[in-house]
Regions:
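Dinucleotide-binding Rossmann-like beta1-alpha1 core, especially the glycine-rich loop
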Residues: 50-127, 250
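Flavin (FAD/FMN) cofactor-binding and adjacent substrate-gating region
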Residues: 96-164, 169-170, 176-179
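Predominantly flavin-linked oxidoreductase catalytic cores and closely associated redox partners
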Residues: 148-233
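C-terminal catalytic lobe of FAD-dependent flavoproteins
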Residues: 294, 298-379
Length: 379
């Protein structure tokens, strides 16, 4: 069956679903999307104005080819829509020279010939004085990196899909996905529709929608906090890279596009279990701010320790931190993308393209064999 004749449902038009809808529609599929809210909402993982894009990968260098594919698609989506969805300002990875993540990022840079610069502690302190450097620290500046605008990206990808013929049902919760003869049935409160295939990108609602999923996706609650610097020029000058610190406490941050504040976030280990995604606790308790105060005092003393803004989001994590990507067992026409474990947004155009491959062709030429693909267990 050709893409032009294939009818594909996209369940969840968020980070992954909006990209999948765009790539499917671009290939001529008849696309119908469903979202319990509307593209660009802040009820799950996408929000907070910025996400980091980087080319060097400190978790696993095998992601780099996917990042390169995503990079090309970011450029393509911007060109097709005329919107600035990301800005390449660089990204600093800082930490002890002996830390494993520093070794892995240098490995990924060497293997894939990535544009970068290595800074020792002296050079780092001189060039980026806003960071307090510890003995033994070094940094890698990933030049093909910067920030993404998440809400704008999702809305832009969804609108581009609609321009290409997709239909998106907003504020429409999918209650059930039922494989049927030669297709799949999507059931909502408004009724049901049948499709040839479905791409399921439910975000933190994965366990609600697929309660019998044989793999664990743990939904965690994460806090983003914004702080105003005392010396704005240090953060918002000619160089204003995003940053990641590996140790002793893993954290990340981005100078905000408005030139006023700096956003900080924490690693998975410091995120609470979210519980029911429909009842997310969005109140940030004072004790949750203590770790931010400690980080600022130790590594970024130029930031005022009282946050000017706090936001709470949800993210799905797998045990391996690798996503679930592929057809569900016993339902080859239902393609799942879930559990991106905090690393999905920068890769979302690539995974949207992979979802289109799997939905239309049943396979993808992209190098995803190392991922914990649905239907098998990664050794």
């Amino acid at each position: 069956m050709s893409a032009a004749r294939k009818r594909v449902a996209v369940v969840g038009v968020g980070t992954m679903g909006s990209q999948a809808a765009w790539r499917l529609a671009a290939r001529g599929a008849e696309v119908v999307g469903y979202d319990r809210f509307a593209p660009g909402h802040d009820r799950s993982a996408a929000g907070g104005e910025t996400r980091i894009f980087r080319s060097a990968h400190f978790e696993d260098s095998r992601y780099v080819p996917l990042l390169k594919h995503a990079d090309a698609l970011w450029e393509q989506l911007q060109q097709e829509t005329g919107r600035e969805l990301r800005r390449l300002t660089g990204c600093l990875l800082m930490g002890p020279t002996e830390h494993q993540q520093m070794a892995t990022v240098l490995q990924s840079i060497a293997e894939h010939d990535l544009d970068h610069e290595v800074l020792d502690a002296e050079a780092l302190a001189k060039r980026f004085p806003q960071y307090r450097i510890e003995d033994g620290d070094a940094a890698v500046l990933d030049r093909r990196a910067g920030f993404i605008r998440p809400e704008l990206t999702i809305q832009t990808a969804a609108r581009r899909a609609e321009q290409l013929g997709a239909v998106i049902h907003r504020y429409t919760t999918v209650r059930e996905i039922v494989p049927v003869a030669n297709g799949v049935e999507i059931r909502t409160d408004a009724g049901s529709e049948c499709f040839d295939t479905a791409v399921v990108t439910p975000g933190p609602w994965v366990n609600d929608l697929l309660p019998d999923l044989p793999w664990d996706v743990e939904i965690r609650r994460l806090v983003s906090a914004w702080f105003v610097p005392t010396t704005p020029d240090a953060w918002f000058g000619e160089e204003r890279p995003a940053f990641i610190r590996t140790a002793p406490t893993h954290c990340y941050g981005l100078p905000s596009p408005d030139g006023i504040s700096v956003k900080l976030g924490l690693s998975r280990a410091l995120h609470r279990i979210a519980g029911d995604p429909n009842q997310l606790d969005r109140t940030v308790q004072p004790q949750e701010l203590e770790i931010f105060s400690e980080l600022i005092g130790r590594h970024m003393p130029d930031l005022h320790p009282d946050p000017t803004r706090l936001s709470v989001y949800m993210e799905g994590y797998t045990e391996s931190s690798r996503p679930l990507v592929g057809p569900l067992p016993g339902a080859d026409n239902v393609v799942l993308l879930a559990g991106f474990s905090g690393h999905g947004f920068k890769l979302s155009p690539a995974f949207g393209d992979i979802a289109a491959d799997l939905a239309l062709d049943g396979t993808s030429e992209q190098p995803i064999d190392f991922i914990s693909t649905v239907g098998r267990t990664e050794a």
